[in-house]
Amino acid sequence: MNSTFNQTDSGIFSNRTEENLLCCNFSSVVTDNGFAAAAPDERSLFIMRIVQIAVMCVLSLTVVFGIFFLGCNLLIKSEGMINFLVTDRRPSKEVEAVIVGAY
């Protein structure tokens, strides 16, 4: 019974990291002109960064215009409320007479 659980016997759970690492030499890819080729991850990271910048610009403009139009709407409503509360004042005839008389 002890022979089935022998520590030297790897069984199903064998440690194959050494065998997996031997197949790759981790050298860079070299093109025809001798320079190392750029990793495709760099290009995708660059594109992702550009997309992030574009999305942030669009969101920023949306927020700025939203605040602007909300402020304009509140300003229009407040002017309407002020005009509703203020009674119309008409200049008296005396004021017109004074203005005409001054010229």
Swiss-Prot record:
Gene from which the chain derives: rprma
Q: Which UniProt keywords apply?
A: Cytoplasm, Membrane, Transmembrane, Transmembrane helix
Q: Which family does it belong to?
A: Belongs to the reprimo family.
Q: How does it sit in the membrane?
A: Single-pass membrane protein
Q: Where is the chain membrane-spanning?
A: 50-70
Q: Which InterPro entries match?
A: Reprimo_fam
Q: Which terms in the GO cellular component ontology are assigned?
A: cytoplasm; membrane
Q: Please state where this protein is localized.
A: Cytoplasm; Membrane
Its name, as the record gives it, is Protein reprimo A
UniProt function note: May be involved in the regulation of p53-dependent G2 arrest of the cell cycle.
What PANTHER family does this protein map onto?
Answer: PROTEIN REPRIMO, PROTEIN REPRIMO-RELATED
Q: What is its main location?
A: cytoplasm
